[in-house]
Amino acid sequence: MMNKYEMIIHWSEEDQLFIAEVPELPGCMADGHSYQEAVSNAVIMINEWIETAKDLGRTIPKPKGKLMYA
């Protein structure tokens, strides 16, 4: 599933992993040994976050799509 949520990806010296955070979805983050793996894992976590929110009847924020203009 394609999504348009903004991701912030950075290297963690402490964990020796790339960390991908999704600020628009509280608590949604993933990691990976490569940049691409972190992004791929974040996409999975976004989809799981949305499915869980639906199951719990919670509001799902609309993506702001900031990166579309970068």
Task: Describe the residue ranges of each PLM region.
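A short, exposed loop/beta-hairpin motif centered on an aromatic-Gly-Thr core
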Residues: 26-37
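Short aromatic-glycine-(Arg/Gly/Cys) micro-motifs in beta-strand/loop hairpins
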Residues: 10-25
